[in-house]
Design a protein with these regions (language model features):
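Catalytic "initiation/cleavage/transfer" segments centered on a nucleophilic residue
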Residues: 161-194
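A common structural junction motif
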Residues: 151-161
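Acidic/proline-rich low-complexity IDRs
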Residues: 1, 13, 159, 163-167
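Signature for HUH/AEP ssDNA processing cores
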Residues: 2-131, 136-152
Length: 194
């Protein structure tokens, strides 16, 4: 499940039933999304997120909070620390692969621990330098409640190895009526930097 195989699954290969499930699990806002541009950065797009965009060749992300500050999922985002990543060009391929293996093994350990607690969760290679572990809610819940829960989950996890970073999504308890909060990249995307 945590294999870094870029061609093992593709969002373009999903059938209609799987596409509907994907949207149900991951899309909380359809009026805005983030799109990765050529240099690897993301740009906010304030237009409807259509199936053509979501399941096309673009790399896109979702904003967790809806306009009422409710969420439908949570995510642990394990990455190689930015300071280490900034030195990637001076590393050998083997050194970089060791960092990828470190984040992979730590994510596997956390996933196994969460499974031992009977906490349903789903890992994925997020592309480039890390992994996500997703949690799906039975119904939309206030982001503040989900943030408290995900912070509690983080406190239960094995200690982070030096050189790794962990982000929690959602990152906000609430947003203003015209706010967006942070986004997280959808699964099955091709990271333009990798």
């Amino acid at each position: 499940m945590l294999n870094k195989q870029k061609d093992s699954h593709s969002k373009n290969d999903l059938n209609a039933k799987d596409r509907d499930l994907f949207k149900q699990l991951f899309i909380n806002r359809t009026d805005v999304y983030a799109c990765q541009v050529a240099n690897g950065d993301y740009s906010q797009v304030k237009s409807p997120l259509t199936d053509e965009i979501l399941f096309g060749d673009q790399t896109v992300g979702t904003y967790n909070l809806d306009r009422n500050s409710y969420v439908i999922n949570a995510c642990l985002d394990f990455d190689i620390d930015k300071k280490i990543h900034e030195t990637k060009d001076s590393m050998s391929a083997d050194e970089w692969d060791q960092w990828i293996q470190t984040v992979k093994q730590h994510t596997k350990s956390c996933f196994a621990y969460l499974q031992s607690l009977d906490i349903p969760c789903y890992p994925e290679f997020s592309g480039y330098k890390g992994y996500h572990i997703w949690f799906f809610l039975d119904k939309p819940m206030p982001a503040a409640d989900v943030r408290r829960w995900i912070q509690h989950i983080r406190a239960l996890l094995p200690a982070m190895p030096k050189g790794l970073d962990l982000e929690l999504f959602p990152k906000q308890d609430k947003i203003s009526a015209d706010g967006y909060g942070n986004f997280v990249k959808f699964p099955l995307q091709v990271n333009r930097k990798s």
